Amino acid sequence: KNSGLESGLMIVQYVAGASLAELHGHAMPRSAFSTSTSAGQEDHVSMGATACWNLLVATERLSEVLACELFVACEALEFEQLQPAAHVRSLKQRVRVISPPLDGDRSTSKELKKIANELWQGGWLARIEAECGRLPR
């Protein structure tokens, strides 16, 4: 709202960019790093456990990126007089319980973390579909 005095959503963009950069790092296939072991008697180590760990961390980073996108989308809806679809309205209401609309610069780190956690746990989809009907798959 106050260009030049407030940063708006700039920091949210930085957070999303940092999480996305880390997500790219976790997308590298672990099988590319197989190594011989047991004095050369074993020529393959699957790195399956490492790949699973990277998948878990990657889903956490993805939830952070999506939380930033969702946060920005909810802010954008504050400036439009349009009525979004029922599922979007329900999702926005859930976000607004965690994060009220911006009325100036403030730290949103705790809010973004809570939104990311809700997305990562996956409970919102079931509750929104129970309220508004099943989304097409």
Task: List PLM regions with ranges.
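C-terminal auxiliary extensions adjacent to catalytic cores
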Residues: 1-137
